[in-house]
A protein has these predicted regions:
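Cell-envelope/extracellular polymer assembly enzymes that use nucleotide-activated donors
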Residues: 5-8, 26, 37, 190
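Short, well-formed alpha-helical segments that are part of the catalytic scaffolds
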Residues: 15-29
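Acidic helix N-cap motif at the loop->helix transition within catalytic regions
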Residues: 19-21, 47-56, 97, 101
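A conserved acidic beta->alpha catalytic loop
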Residues: 26, 42-51
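Short beta-strand/loop segment that forms part of the nucleotide-sugar
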Residues: 35-44, 65-69, 94
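Glycine-rich, basic loop-to-helix element that forms the pyrophosphate-binding segment
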Residues: 68-84
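Donor-binding/catalytic cores of nucleotide-activated saccharide
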Residues: 73, 94-195
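Short aromatic/hydrophobic "clamp" motif used to bind/position activated sugar donors
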Residues: 89
């Protein structure tokens, strides 16, 4: 693979044998696999998650990688970040999926990048979480960071999760941010430091 990786999708996978394939397949339908990589970070599963991941690697080749980490979603995401080669980072939970129509929005945004973080809409419920449409997207620049902070407080479910967003990798490293290893609220921490 000689192409520059544009997007690294990081999937923490703990006991995700039943959902991992759908998550990975949804990514392959929304991204040009020559410019994307999918990092499956298996972190202590007791089911057959590892076997599912190996089958996906056989199917998609070097664009899909299996990484092992200690237990914990934050450890898995950190391990994914260490191995990510993409300019942009997308965190996807193993039970999430991204709808195919979002490909247009994702590429349009990052190819014309005006920001370091893009927040998309998603749906929670019987249907898994997914990046939905462009209409709900809002841009925040330096002069409107205070507005975003207020919106984060008003709508924590939308803003305080790492999924449903695309992060420029350099901003994560610029602020020397790693997800807190044992904190179940690491989702809040990453966005607090970015803004």
């Amino acid at each position: 693979m000689n192409e520059k990786i544009l997007i690294s999708y990081i999937i923490p996978a703990y006991n995700a044998a039943d959902t991992l394939e759908r998550a990975v397949e949804s990514i392959t339908h929304t991204c040009n696999m020559e410019k994307c990589e999918i990092l499956i970070v298996e972190n202590g599963s007791t089911d057959y998650t590892n076997s599912v991941a190996l089958k996906l690697i056989q199917k998609y080749g070097e664009n899909v990688k299996l990484i092992h980490s200690e237990k914990g979603v934050s450890r898995a995401r950190n391990e994914g970040l260490k191995n990510a080669r993409g300019e942009w980072i997308v965190f996807v939970d193993a039970d999430d999926y991204i709808v195919s129509k979002s490909k247009k929005y994702i590429y349009e945004d990052i190819l014309n990048a005006k920001a370091d973080l893009y927040v998309y809409s998603y749906e929670i419920g019987n249907r898994a979480n997914y990046i939905n449409n462009k209409e709900e997207k809002t841009y925040y620049f330096n002069d409107s960071a205070e507005k975003m902070k207020l919106e984060m407080i008003a709508n924590p479910t939308k803003f305080m999760q790492v999924w449903g967003k695309i992060f420029r990798k350099s901003i994560i490293y610029k602020i020397e941010l790693a997800l807190i290893q044992k904190c179940s609220f690491q989702r809040i921490v990453i966005l607090h430091y970015i803004i």
